[in-house]
Amino acid sequence: PVLFPFVGAPKNKEYRYEGRTYPMGQHGFARDMEFDLEAQEGKSIWFVLSSTEETYAKYPFRFRLHIGYTLDENEVSVHWKVDNTDEKPMYFSIGAHPAFLCPINGEQDKTGYRLRFGDLTDKLHHHGNTPDGMAVMTDEELELEDGEAVITPGFFDKCTYMVEGAQTGEVSILDRDGEAYVTVRFD
């Protein structure tokens, strides 16, 4: 799903802006809304979500959120563009929760699969989660060996691995032979 205008869960499912309290569920509302087809040409397609009175009641800003997908051989590029159509500064965050089959080929056991974190070689900072979905800062770090982490049972159970700032520009899932079968690049 697309996470907009919030990434994460606000405390008590609400936030304050200019002295007023607004309701907001985990990761905002875009993931629960229907986007309109904006354009389709060749191997590209664009969708748009425009603010409504319903969104304005939760998020007091007028906007247009454009999401484009382009297919090029075995690669899919995703592009986000946010237009502030209001007359005031607009505060937002945007993110995604892509999901990939692991292990590949319907195998049952993830043992031996790894994650490679691009040019990051030693460790990745990560966050814990509260039961209601809020990310909490921890001092924990995922130790990497030559930029890789072994996926073990329970690897994703207790925390969220967030790639933030300039920690790395790509993450790959490696099969048991060490071959990347999915790579996500971002900038």
State what each model feature region is.
Residues C102, G106-D187:
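Active-site/ligand-binding surface loops and adjacent short beta/alpha elements
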Residues P1-T21:
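Acidic-aromatic substrate-binding/catalytic surfaces of carbohydrate-active enzymes
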Residues E14, T21, S44, E75-S77, ...:
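Structural motif
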Residues S51-P98, I104:
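Acidic, contiguous internal or C-terminal segments within carbohydrate-active enzymes
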Residues R20-E73:
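Extended, loop-rich substrate-binding clefts of extracytoplasmic carbohydrate-active enzymes
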Residues K11, M33, L65-I67, G169, ...:
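Residue-level marker for the onset of beta-strands and adjacent loop->beta junctions
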Residues S44-V48, H66-G68, S77-K81, R114-R116, ...:
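Beta-strand secondary-structure signal
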Residues R16, E38-A39, T70, D83, ...:
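Well-ordered beta-strand positions
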